[in-house]
Swiss-Prot record:
Residues 102-224 form the MPN domain. The lineage of its organism: Bacteria, Pseudomonadati, Pseudomonadota, Gammaproteobacteria, Pseudomonadales. Belongs to the UPF0758 family. InterPro entries: MPN, RadC_JAB, RuvA_2-like, UPF0758, UPF0758_CS, UPF0758_N. Pfam families: RadC, UPF0758_N. Zn(2+) binds at H173, H175, D186. The keyword Zinc applies. A motif (JAMM motif) lies at residues 173-186. One of its GO terms (molecular function) is metal ion binding. Keywords: Hydrolase, Metal-binding, Metalloprotease, Protease, Zinc. This is UPF0758 protein PSEEN5431. NCBIfam families: PRK00024.1, radc.
């Protein structure tokens, strides 16, 4: 059935306007973004099919370009719109933390780091550089690939910290497997970087690991001692 034939209050766009975005299901939210269906499938049927095919809303949002464009009803225009939407979200998160100390809102900082890393298909390692009041100066992804002591160069982390005139920083990396539990290499790497950065009076505030669910703070679990 064409959505125009539905009761007005049940159409996704009208439902959003009348009840708020929080009242919509994942399929309805995706349908609002898509805007229209394809031949033989209305937009809500298309949205439901995509959620099943990709495995959920997060997987649709994080799909790579080739996989996204390979689906019926999706094309370069919708892909570019989606990427713009995701970047707007990341920048909004960045603005929410840029004028305050990371100590004042650690949850917002972890959510920002998750937004920056969760879409990465392979392991990446980054730093959020902080000023003397622990306010963000810059975020950079420094290394890609398997994250261990052999692939991370302390001198590069030190160099970037000096370049940004950072007084402190938060280390971060992702676990594409979804499991946020740190490995022994993660712990040893963190302590090695902590010692290297201490030589230039730069403090490691935390090391955040991004996976499924809430990011893990190594400082909160006692893994930064030493």
């Amino acid at each position: 059935m064409n959505i125009r034939e539905w009761p007005v209050e049940e159409r996704p766009r009208e439902k959003l306007l009348n009840r708020g975005a929080g009242s919509l299901s994942d399929a309805e939210l995706l349908a609002v973004f898509l805007g229209s269906g394809v031949k033989g499938r209305n937009v809500l049927e298309l949205a439901r099919g995509l959620l099943v095919k990709f495995g959920g809303l997060r997987q649709v949002l994080e799909a790579d370009r080739q996989a996204f464009l390979g689906e019926l009803g999706l094309g370069p225009v919708r892909y570019s719109q989606l990427q713009a939407l995701l970047e707007i979200g990341r920048r909004n998160l960045a603005m929410s933390i840029e004028r305050e100390s990371v100590m004042d809102n650690p949850l917002a900082v972890r959510r920002y780091l998750k937004a920056m890393l969760r879409h990465e298909a392979s392991e990446v390692f980054g730093c959020l550089f902080l000023d003397t009041k622990h306010r963000p100066l810059a975020f950079e992804i420094l290394f890609r690939g398997t994250i261990d002591r052999a692939s991370i160069y302390p001198r590069e982390v030190v160099r970037r910290a000096l370049l940004h005139n950072a007084a402190a920083l938060i280390l971060c990396h992702n676990h594409p497997s979804g499991n946020c539990e740190p490995s022994q290499d993660d712990v040893h790497l963190t302590l090695m970087l902590k010692r290297s950065l201490a030589l230039i009076d730069v403090r490691v505030v935390d090391h955040v690991i991004v996976g499924d669910g809430e990011p893990l703070s190594m400082i909160e679990h006692g893994w930064l001692a030493g």
